[in-house]
């Protein structure tokens, strides 16, 4: 796993027990999962809009910025649910080299 993701995972874990006024992440944890999910949704929309703007202008600066926000808030969400970024990387590794169609077909069917 990248050093950046490892360091960030450590910080996110440490913030779980911190006072809400000590950091942005601690305040998110204190507000609860619904607030964290709201932020993930907000950052998802902002990333989509930045991608549309980048496609039109060729300037990807805002897209990179918004994607970083989305990844960050997704990592906060995972940490809030007791998951480590390595679990996502492991899943990506598992999928590497698989056809997207084959991977999707192998998933359990929703009812």
From Swiss-Prot:
EC code: 3.6.1.31
A cellular-component GO term for this protein: cytoplasm
SUPFAM superfamilies: all-alpha NTP pyrophosphatases
Gene Ontology molecular function: any one: phosphoribosyl-ATP diphosphatase activity
Gene Ontology terms: biological process: L-histidine biosynthetic process
Domain of life: Bacteria
Keywords: Amino-acid biosynthesis, ATP-binding, Cytoplasm, Histidine biosynthesis, Hydrolase, Nucleotide-binding
Subcellular location: Cytoplasm
Pfam families linked: PRA-PH (PF01503)
Catalytic reaction annotation: 1-(5-phospho-beta-D-ribosyl)-ATP + H2O = 1-(5-phospho-beta-D-ribosyl)-5'-AMP + diphosphate + H(+)
Principal localisation: cytoplasm
Alphabetized InterPro entries for the sequence: HisE, PRib-ATP_PPHydrolase-like
Pathway(s) this gene product operates in, as recorded in its UniProt entry: Amino-acid biosynthesis; L-histidine biosynthesis; L-histidine from 5-phospho-alpha-D-ribose 1-diphosphate: step 2/9
Family: Belongs to the PRA-PH family.
Record-given protein name: Phosphoribosyl-ATP pyrophosphatase
Species: Ectopseudomonas mendocina (strain ymp)
């Amino acid at each position: 796993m990248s050093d950046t993701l490892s360091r960030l995972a450590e910080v996110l874990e440490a913030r779980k027990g911190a006072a809400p006024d000590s950091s942005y992440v601690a305040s998110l944890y204190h507000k609860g999962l619904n607030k964290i999910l709201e932020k993930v949704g907000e950052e998802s929309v902002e990333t989509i809009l930045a991608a549309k703007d980048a496609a039109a202008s060729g300037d990807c600066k805002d897209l990179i910025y918004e994607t970083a926000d989305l990844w960050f808030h997704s990592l906060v969400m995972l940490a809030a649910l007791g998951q480590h970024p390595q679990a996502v990387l492991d899943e990506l590794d598992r999928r590497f080299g698989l056809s997207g169609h084959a991977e999707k077909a192998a998933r359990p069917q929703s009812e």
